[in-house]
Amino acid sequence: MIETSNITALKNVLEVALLTSHEPLSLDDMLRLFTEKMERATLRMLLDELKQDWAERTMELVQVASGYRFQARDEYSVFLARLNPERQAKYSRAVMETLEIIAYRQPVTRGDIEEIRGVAVNPNVMRQLQERDWIDVIGQREVPGRPSLYGTTKHFLDDLNIRSLSELPPMEDFTQQEIPI
């Protein structure tokens, strides 16, 4: 059993690491913070307690695809947007349709995307999605020519604030979803 004072110290270490990290931290990342071996169950318990500690505050501890992070609660986003009045990037219909096909039907080839959309996929669309780190090549189809198979990345899931593809909104709502730049 962990002593109460020790629990507070451990939570403080987790809190400062999560608050100062630019990226979500995985369980493995957080386990490396401590010199003594810690069980994953203990770490999860500490994270649950930390989440409860922040329950009535302006920020919340959330789990996304690549780990855990602190973020502002949704009700404060309107105020924070005033600090950075930059407009959100508008993505073309072709970009959004291509991303939708990849997200919901992965793994897919460019040929699959072209067949579904009924038009050729502009290489710039694929490049834009890869530069944004929303899609990546995840393999090759075992057919002549071995075309690349595309799938979404953890960064894509993180930007949507979800942990897995099963949490994606219904397909018909996807293109209306606001995706942060």
For each feature predicted by the language model, list its residue ranges:
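Phosphate-centric recognition/catalysis
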Residues: 1-5, 9-10, 94, 155-181
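Short alpha-helical segments that sit at the start of domains
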Residues: 1-13, 70-96, 131, 178
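Short capping segments at the starts of secondary-structure elements
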Residues: 17-26, 38, 104-109
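Short acidic, hydrophobic short linear motifs in intrinsically disordered regions
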Residues: 24-33, 107-117
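Short amphipathic alpha-helical interaction segments
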Residues: 38-47, 117-134, 144-147
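A short, conserved structural fragment
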Residues: 51-62, 132-142
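Short, cationic-aromatic polyanion-contact patches
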Residues: 64-83, 139-162
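Glycine-rich active-site/cofactor-binding loop and its immediate structural neighborhood
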Residues: 87-114
